[in-house]
C-alpha cells in the first residue's frame, strides 16, 4: 500500500488547468523497421527534441512482466521500500527529487546500470524483479545504440557509432529509473493539477521512456507551450538530452518535459538514461560544425553531471556553458 501523505499546497506545486487535457496528434512517429527512420529521427530531434518509436523489437510480455513486478515493489509497506533507500543518489526515494528542494507526487527507484545489485531488498519476488530489470536494461542499451546509429546516419557523419560508442563503453554512466505516481483523488483541487515530476531537461545524450497507459506526461514546444503526450504502453518515447544538444552544436535541442499526477489512476514509467563515461569530453562534433562557431564551451560529463546536482530541476543548466546564445 502506498503511503505518500495527502498533498498540501505548502508541499507541492500545482498547475492551473482550466481546460480538459487534450492529447497532441503532432508527436513525431518513427518506425524503426522502415528505411526512412534515420531521416525522421533527425527531423524530430530538430523540431521537437522528442519522438515516439514503434516496431522496436522489445517483446511486450517482457515489458508487462517488469511493470507488474514494479507495481508489486511499490505496493510493499513503506518500511520495506525504505530498506532500498535513501536515494543518495541510488536506491528508493519518495517526494524529494534531488538535493535542492524539488518536490513531486512520486516515489521511485534510481539505479546504475553498471552493477547487478544496486538496491538492497531481497526475497523471491525482489530477486525476480532484479532479474527482469537486468534484462530490460540490456534491451534498452541495445535499442539506444540502434537509434543513435540511425541518428548518425541521418546526420551523415562518421563514424556511425560516434554516439553509440559512448553508451557501449564499459565506463558509460547510464542510469535506469522507475517512477511511480500514485493515484490520489484529492488532486482535483480548485481546477489545478499536481506536479508529479517538475519541468526539466535530461542532461544525458538521450533517454528512453516507457510508461503504462496512464496520462500525465507533457513536453514543452519551442514557443513555451505545453502539450500532453498520448500514453501508449506498447511504444517508447525518446528525449534529446543536453549532451546531445551540445554535440550537435544546438542543431538538436533537449526537450523540456514534466509529469502531472493523475487523480484516478497510478502512473508507472521506466526511463533509461544514456550517459557517457564520466571522463568523456562533451563538445560540438567537428563534423557538424562546417565552419560554424561553437555555441558551447567544452566540458567533461563529470563536470556537467556535478553541476546538475547543484541546480534545481527547472534551471537552464547549459547556460553556464554557452559561448553565445543558442537559437
UniProtKB/Swiss-Prot annotation:
For activity, the cofactor(s) needed are: Fe cation
Tell me, which GO biological process terms does this entry list? gibberellin biosynthetic process
Q: List the disulfide bonds.
A: none
* Keyword annotations from UniProtKB, A to Z: Dioxygenase, Iron, Metal-binding, Oxidoreductase
Q: Which InterPro entries match?
A: DIOX_N (IPR026992), IPNS-like_FE2OG_OXY (IPR044861), IPNS-like_sf (IPR027443), Iron_ascorbate_oxido_reductase (IPR050231), Oxoglu/Fe-dep_dioxygenase_dom (IPR005123)
Under the heading Gene3D superfamilies, the entry gives: B-lactam Antibiotic, Isopenicillin N Synthase, Chain
Annotated active site? 267
| Domain Fe2OG dioxygenase span(s) in chain numbering | 171-276
Task: Give binding positions for Fe cation.
Answer: 200, 202, 257
Q: What general EC class does the enzyme of this chain belong to? A: oxidoreductase
| Enzyme Commission number, as recorded | 1.14.11.13
User: What reaction does this catalyse?
Assistant: gibberellin A1 + 2-oxoglutarate + O2 = gibberellin A8 + succinate + CO2
GO molecular function ontology, one term from the record:
gibberellin 2-beta-dioxygenase activity
* Pathway linked to the protein: Plant hormone biosynthesis; gibberellin biosynthesis
Recorded superkingdom: Eukaryota
PROSITE patterns recorded: FE2OG_OXY (PS51471)
Q: What happens when the gene is disrupted?
A: Plants display to the slender phenotype, characterized by large amounts of GA20 that cannot be degraded, and is metabolized to excess GA1 on germination, producing plants with a characteristic slender or hyperelongated phenotype.
**Classification via Pfam families:** 2OG-FeII_Oxy, DIOX_N
Q: Where expressed (tissue)? A: Predominantly expressed in roots, flowers, young fruits and seeds.
Kindly give the PANTHER family that the UniProt entry links to this protein.
2-OXOGLUTARATE (2OG) AND FE(II)-DEPENDENT OXYGENASE SUPERFAMILY PROTEIN-RELATED (PTHR47990)
Family note: Belongs to the iron/ascorbate-dependent oxidoreductase family. GA2OX subfamily.
Q: What does this protein do?
A: Catalyzes the 2-beta-hydroxylation of several biologically active gibberellins, leading to the homeostatic regulation of their endogenous level. Catabolism of gibberellins (GAs) plays a central role in plant development. Converts GA9/GA20 to GA51/GA29 and GA4/GA1 to GA34/GA8.
What protein name does the entry list? Gibberellin 2-beta-dioxygenase 1
Species the sequence originates in: Pisum sativum (Garden pea)
